[in-house]
Amino acid sequence: MPDISPVAEFDFVIVGAGSAGCLLANRLSANPDHRVLLIEAGGRDNWFWIKVPVGYLYTIANPRTDWCFTTEPDPGLAGRSIIYARGRVIGGCSSINAMIHMRGQASDYTLWAQATGDERWLWGGPDRPGETLAIYKQLEHYFGGADDWHGSGGEIRVERPRVRWKILDAWQAAAAQVGIAPIDEFNRGDNAGSAYFHVNQRRGRRWSMADAFLHPVAHRPNLTVYTHAQALQVLMDDQVHDHQRRGAWTTAQRRATGVRLLKDGQIVDVRARREVVLSAGAIGSPHLMQVSG
């Protein structure tokens, strides 16, 4: 095993430069007093096929940009396993996916509010409790301008598809005949129906969450980005002091103090004075928690 290099120290250590990680790096580094480290196992997102919309045919199942996970064989698939794409590149899945911009159902956020006991998670809207819709609008730059459902001036570009297909129009007409009604869009809190998806593009090119949140602030002197750095373990401290017991830590017996990672053939420990944030994806984050005890 390689030797452990001298420890680097930051205020916040973010594991995973996907959609959530890019946004968190943007917001946390907005305070110049915060030293922020963003860790990404993959490389930069400057490959031609990432930017071209059809390029997801070349980025998915490609180890340059994808973890290349596959599912277990399933009887419902005649024993086949299928590709389970997870981005391994700056921008994460937003750099390799089909660019579909689709919010959840309003009822999904009701479940979140019930689970947390916090009404701010409710969908919201005029004269209704909840902040989710308002936050979506704040983040968005919608091609049609601001309205009851969409915002303008935010970082996330939302456009309509640049082409229509006769076969899709025929499918929509057939769906209507069996009771699946055509709707204007999928982002108003009720996704039942058929419509063309909105897409995260700008002038016909992919607009990833790295384009939206990371690249515009990459010049900040208090923001450091490690690429080709594989997080191996969250470092823990068994001694949790009273002044550290806030929020989710109230009943914690152990505190995350840093991350051990593999970079350039060396094991590197990075320390977090304030918080370690796991944004390594639906597979990566649970895996890190498991190997960290």
Regions found by a protein language model. Give the residues of each.
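Conserved redox-cofactor binding core of oxidoreductases
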Residues: T116-A256
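Active-site-proximal beta-strand/loop segments in catalytic clefts of secreted hydrolases
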Residues: A17, I39-G42, A98-M99, P161, ...
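Glycine-rich loop(s) and the adjacent beta-strand/alpha-helix scaffold that form part
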Residues: D33-R35, G43-W47, T132-I135, V234-D237, ...
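N-terminal glycine-rich phosphate/pyrophosphate-binding loop and immediately adjacent elements
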Residues: M1-K137
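Short, solvent-exposed loop/turn and secondary-structure capping segments
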Residues: N26, W47-V52, M99, G145-D147, ...
